[in-house]
Amino acid sequence: MKKILACALLSLGLLAPAQAQTVNAGTYDVEGTNLDGSSYSGTATISLTSETTCSIEWSTGSTTSTGICMLYDNAFAAAYVLGDAVGLIVYEVKSDGSLEGAWTISGKNGSGTEVLTPQ
């Protein structure tokens, strides 16, 4: 009886694993807050380099930074260079394809926030 119930549930898709999130290559609108709480905006371009890694470039105002990124389940992380400093941002991949995260820079106190929305 248990086998019949399990088969019935499987056929209905109730025991199927949840779909993994994905991040698409392309251009994203950027909205964020700096370490001091001030806001910034711009664009970010993600280019896939393998099934799990990518490169990312942010352009916010007169600032451009580049980094390497990776996707793991619904977490998307990027390490980047900003001037002479190294930074890290960790995003949560949302069901609508947007990315919501928090970032920091080496040697600085606090963290900023950032949302990337696909264009």
Q: Language-model features: where?
A:
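Positively charged n-region of N-terminal signal peptides that target proteins for export
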Residues: 1-4
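Central antiparallel beta-sheet cores of small beta-barrel/beta-sandwich binding domains
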Residues: 21-119
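Bacterial Sec-dependent signal peptides at the C-terminal "C-region" and cleavage site
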Residues: 15-21
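Bacterial N-terminal signal peptides
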Residues: 7-13
